[in-house]
Curated annotation (Swiss-Prot):
Protein name stated in the entry: Beta-casein
Modified sites of kind Phosphoserine: S30, S32, S33, S34
UniProt-annotated location(s): Secreted
Stated family: Belongs to the beta-casein family.
InterPro entries: Casein, Casein_beta, Casein_CS
Domain of life: Eukaryota
Leader sequence residues: 1-15
GO CC list: extracellular space
Protein species of origin: Bubalus bubalis
Lineage: Eukaryota, Metazoa, Chordata, Craniata, Vertebrata
Gene: CSN2
Task of the protein: Important role in determination of the surface properties of the casein micelles.
Tissue-wise expression: Mammary gland specific. Secreted in milk.
């Protein structure tokens, strides 16, 4: 009897242990099934979100397309556009475009810089010496003396006066011109003219004078 009771007790204990072992297995199965359901639900949620996003994009494209169609070119005539132009149309004359030669600001700036860097050399002018016009001395010729018809005493007093040479004009030529003029000057032949005496008549004095064809350019002193 004791053996049977012990066997029953052992069997009960084993049965309890088996039940305890079966409970975690069910829990594991339930957990695994719950995880699968969670993943399935997540997949459904993602699919739903992707469908919503795709629907929103389609709606935006539908809104953009009619706006682009309204902006398209509208031709006034319903017929097709001819690809080739008719031959009767004369060719268009192209008017030549005239560009004024304006300097660009960059080029102007470069030219100004060049002028500032390399200034032009100013040539010094040669000094101009004052040149006085040559004054011809108004000398009386034989015809002038005859045409004067002066009285005899006045003419004698004028004849007795010794000739006074005029003061020479003051010139300041360069040294080179002065040297050339001095080297090329020829000696003037001096003729001895007899000085008229007081008792000599005018007609005798006029015989000694040579006829002068033109005005004398320079006063020459009379050498006695």
């Amino acid at each position: 009897m004791k053996v049977l009771i012990l066997a029953c007790l052992v069997a009960l204990a084993l049965a309890r242990e088996l039940e305890e072992l079966n409970v975690p297995g069910e829990i594991v199965e339930s957990l695994s099934s719950s995880e699968e359901s969670i993943t399935h639900i997540n997949k459904k949620i993602e699919k739903f979100q992707s469908e919503e996003q795709q629907q929103m994009e389609d709606e935006l494209q539908d809104k953009i397309h009619p706006f682009a169609q309204t902006q398209s070119l509208v031709y006034p005539f319903p017929g097709p556009i001819p690809k080739s132009l008719p031959q009767n149309i004369p060719p268009l004359t192209q008017t030549p475009v005239v560009v004024p030669p304006f300097l660009q600001p960059e080029i102007m700036g470069v030219s100004k810089v060049k002028e500032a860097m390399a200034p032009k050399h100013k040539e010094m002018p040669f000094p101009k010496y004052p040149v006085e016009p040559f004054t011809e001395s108004q000398s009386l010729t034989l015809t002038d003396v005859e045409n004067l018809h002066l009285p005899l005493p006045l003419l004698q007093s004028w004849m007795h006066q010794p000739p006074q040479p005029l003061p020479p004009t003051v010139m300041f030529p360069p040294q080179s011109v002065l040297s050339l003029s001095q080297s090329k000057v020829l000696p003037v032949p001096q003729k001895a003219v007899p000085y008229p005496q007081r008792d000599m008549p005018i007609q005798a004095f006029l015989l000694y004078q040579e006829p002068v064809l033109g005005p004398v350019r320079g006063p020459f002193p009379i050498i006695v």
